[in-house]
UniProtKB/Swiss-Prot annotation:
Taxonomic path: Eukaryota, Metazoa, Chordata, Craniata, Vertebrata
Xref: Pfam families: CHCH
GO biological process annotation, one example: mitochondrial respiratory chain complex assembly
Domain CHCH: 61-105
Organism for this UniProt entry: Mus musculus (Mouse)
GO molecular function: protein-disulfide reductase activity
Chain ranges for the short sequence motif Cx9C motif 2 as given in the UniProt record: 87-97
Matching PANTHER family: COILED-COIL-HELIX-COILED-COIL-HELIX DOMAIN CONTAINING 4 (PTHR21622), MITOCHONDRIAL INTERMEMBRANE SPACE IMPORT AND ASSEMBLY PROTEIN 40 (PTHR21622:SF8)
Cysteine pairs bridged by disulfides in the record: 53-55, 64-97, 74-87
Name of the protein: Mitochondrial intermembrane space import and assembly protein 40
Quaternary data: Monomer. Can form homooligomers. Interacts with GFER and forms transient disulfide bonds with GFER. Interacts with MICU1. Interacts with COX19 forming transient intermolecular disulfide bridges. Interacts with COA7 through transient intermolecular disulfide bonds. Interacts with AIFM1; the interaction increases in presence of NADH. Interacts with NDUFB10.
InterPro entries, alphabetized: CHCH (IPR010625), CHCHD4 (IPR039289)
Length: 139
């Protein structure tokens, strides 16, 4: 006998082997592309930018949200041969704003790692032997 149990936000459904073997009678409903409550990707069906898309990571709503929207919109709607080449001022304004809030908009880790000076490696007896072997085999 199958049954359903609710545990907090979870709904647990137990089915018998017989229940599991019968074909499903569930009907799939096609998504309505014009449903305003339906989640969409970055670009809405009408071509507009979906500022509520989680893919933007909240960039459109932070302290530099207006600068981000301006730069992103300019790039999205750009018709230049080099797409976005007409948006330099908007991207510069966004970058300047983001630099005012380093805790909210941290620099990429790669850039931070490149900025760190490389520490010299101490030569040990093992590295000297390896180097000598390499020189011996290469000549």
């Amino acid at each position: 006998m199958s049954y359903c149990r609710q545990e907090g936000k979870d709904r647990i459904i137990f089915v018998t082997k017989e229940d599991h073997e019968t074909p499903s009678s569930a009907e799939l409903v096609a998504d309505d592309p014009n449903d305003p409550y339906e989640e969409h990707g970055l670009i809405l069906p009408n071509g507009d930018i979906n500022w509520n898309c989680p893919c933007l990571g909240g960039m459109a709503s932070g302290p530099c949200g207006e600068q981000f929207k301006s730069a992103f919109s300019c790039f999205h709607y750009s018709t230049e041969d080099i797409k976005g080449s007409d948006c330099i001022d908007q991207f510069r304004a966004m970058q300047e704003c983001m630099q005012k809030y380093p805790d909210l908009y941290p620099q990429d880790e790669e850039e931070e790692e490149e900025a760190k000076p490389v520490e010299p490696v101490e030569e040990t007896a093992d590295t000297k032997v390896s180097a000598a072997k390499e020189q011996g085999t290469s000549s």
